[in-house]
Amino acid sequence: MAKYTEEQLLELKSEAHTPKPEILDAFNKLIEEVKESIEQHQQHQRKWHNGDTYIDEHGHERSYHHINRRRQSKGASGVPRPNLRKKSEPVVDEDGWATLSKPKKGSFAEGDAIEERIKFRETNNSGAGIKARPNNKNLGSSKAVDPREIASDKQTKAFNAFAALGDEDDDDEDDE
C-alpha cells in the first residue's frame, strides 16, 4: 500500500473522485469524533497525571490517588480463598448426556434418623400431646388475677386542694 504525506493528499484532493459523497461525509464526521475523544482523553490524563507521582518500593511510578482509597479484602491480594462449597459433579448416563447433580445436604431423614422420626410421630399422634411448661421467670405470673386486687391498685381517695387549704390550721399545730 502506498504511503502519502498530508501535502500529497491535499494536492490529489482536487483530482480525486468520490462516487458517494455521503460516505466521505460520514468518514469525515467519524474522524472528528475520534479527534474529540482523543482530546477528552488527553484532558483526563492532564487532570489526573499532573506530576503528582512518586516511585514506589518496586521502582514503579505511581500517583497519590490510590493512597486514600479503601484497601481490598485480604482475599483479593492475589491469594484466592478456598471454596468450601461442594461442587456439583457431572453424571454421565448411558446415552452420553452429562448432567450436573447438586450435592445432597444432610437432613433429618437420612439413615437411622428415620426410625426416630417415626417413633416421635407415633407418640404425638396418641392424642396426649406434648406438655410444655412456660418459663415464668421471663413471662408474667400464671396465677389467676383476683378482680379485688386490681381495684386495690386504684387511687381510692382523690386529692382535694380546697380541703388542703382549709386544713392549714391543723398543720400549724403540728409544727409547734
From Swiss-Prot:
Looking up Pfam families in the UniProt record yields:
CAF20
Location in or out of the cell: Cytoplasm
Compositionally biased intervals (Basic and acidic residues): 55-64, 145-155
Report residue spans for region: Disordered: 37-155
Q: Which domain of life is it from?
A: Eukaryota
Keyword set, alphabetical order: Cytoplasm, Initiation factor, Phosphoprotein, Protein biosynthesis, Protein synthesis inhibitor, Translation regulation
Which is an annotated GO molecular function term of this record? eukaryotic initiation factor 4E binding
GO cellular component terms listed in the entry, alphabetical order: cytoplasm
Chief location of this protein within or outside the cell: cytoplasm
Task: Please explain the role this protein plays, according to its UniProt record.
Answer: Acts as an inhibitor of cap-dependent translation. Competes with eIF4G1 and EAP1 for binding to eIF4E and interferes with the formation of the eIF4F complex, inhibiting translation and stabilizing mRNA.
Q: Which family does it belong to?
A: Belongs to the CAF20 family.
Q: What is this protein called?
A: Cap-associated protein CAF20
